[in-house]
UniProtKB/Swiss-Prot annotation:
Family: Belongs to the UPF0098 family.
Alphabetized InterPro entries for the sequence: PEBP (IPR008914), PEBP-like_sf (IPR036610), YbhB_YbcL/LppC-like (IPR005247)
NCBIfam families for the chain: YbhB/YbcL family Raf kinase inhibitor-like protein
The protein's name: UPF0098 protein CT_736
Source domain of life: Bacteria
Length: 150
């Protein structure tokens, strides 16, 4: 399975329009080579470079989307999501744009193909979602972009 974006390549800067200094909309994403047996897709976006003074665990969850149809091949920028969304670290549902407080940060977009459709309960945490996904992951993909404020 592969996860790519028309807006940035792996390891390259995420354009400003997708950050807190821009419009703050989600970037376009494309899923390919999804296994035929997949029943749903999950997307988790996180920043592992958060200073300990901001978050002790150094991790910020920017977006959680699950129960995406496995036949979805693209999410347009700022797309309305026809799936279930979980809580980001800000305690909100939806995309939280990159806004690093100190330096360049890495933003990992993780895609998972599952052999099940999960509960439609909205607002779960990453930990709750990972627990529900346990034993059901049949493929994964990763995309990483960076962002640093001007």
């Amino acid at each position: 399975m592969q996860l790519t974006s028309q807006a940035f390549s792996y390891g390259r800067p995420i354009p400003k329009k997708y950050s807190c200094q821009g419009v703050g909309i989600s970037p376009p994403l494309s899923f390919s080579d999804v296994p035929r047996e997949a029943k749903s897709l999950v997307l988790i976006v996180e920043d592992p470079d958060v200073p300990p003074s901001v978050r002790e665990d150094g991790l910020w969850i920017h977006w959680i989307v699950y129960n995406l149809s496995p036949v979805v091949s693209n999410l347009a920028e700022g797309a309305q999501i026809f799936a279930v969304q979980g809580l980001n670290t800000a305690g909100e549902i939806g995309y939280c744009p990159p806004c690093p407080p100190d330096a360049k940060h890495r933003y990992y977009f993780y895609a998972y193909a599952l052999d099940v459709v999960l509960s439609d309960e909205e607002g779960v945490t990453k930990e709750q979602l990972l627990e529900a996904m346990d034993g059901h992951i049949i493929a994964t993909a990763e995309l990483m972009g960076t962002y640093e404020k001007d």
